[in-house]
Design a protein with these regions (language model features):
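Short, surface-exposed helix-loop/turn micro-motifs enriched in polar/charged residues
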Residues: 103-107
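N-terminal intrinsically disordered, low-complexity segments enriched in P/E/S/T
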Residues: 1-102, 118-164
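P-loop NTPase catalytic core of nucleic-acid-dependent motor ATPases
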Residues: 108, 112-118
């Protein structure tokens, strides 16, 4: 995987607990599972935080290779039972908009750019996001870099967000 923007890579992958070699082999394993149809919808949910970060690396790389002529998505529905962290939210939005291993950002600024059309993604701004079972997410959210209310406020700036 070639990264053109070193700062973007460092922001996505800032866990010093793992080496670059760990990251390489984890990404390799995830790509293998994806190519062999072992990593389908919501596969990311069973991954630990490091593996989710690697999942988002792969999604970012694939997004750069995509043909952006696909139909624009106007609305997605998220189930709060699958959102327990900031990385879960990025993985889930990416999957709902772009399919398995879809990319819609891996940090606040990248998500905003994807939602508002600054980065070519298959979204019709403003994207409507319906977040079911929000209370479950709220009570189980583990914020590594932010709290769930920060995410809600941030998403509300670039999308139409409905919480249920």
């Amino acid at each position: 995987v070639i990264y053109h923007n070193k700062e973007e890579l460092e922001e996505i992958y800032s866990d010093k607990e793992y080496s670059d070699l760990d990251s390489f082999f984890t990404r390799k394993q995830l790509i293998y599972k994806y190519l062999n149809h072992e990593g389908g919808e919501k596969y990311w949910f069973s991954l630990n935080l490091f593996e989710k970060t690697c999942w988002l690396h792969i999604a970012l790389f694939l997004a750069r290779l995509e043909n952006h002529e696909s139909e624009k998505v106007k609305e997605i529905t998220l189930d709060g039972y699958y959102i327990k962290s900031e990385l879960d939210l990025y993985c889930y939005i990416g999957e709902e908009v772009c399919g398995v291993l879809g990319y819609m950002g891996a940090n606040f600024s990248a998500l905003r750019d994807c939602l508002d059309g600054s980065i070519s993604r298959p979204v019709q701004p403003p994207l409507k996001i319906v977040w079911k079972n929000f209370e479950y997410s709220k009570h189980n959210f583990v914020g590594q870099y932010c709290e769930i209310q920060d995410m809600v406020n941030f998403i509300s700036e670039s999308a139409v967000l409905e919480l249920y």
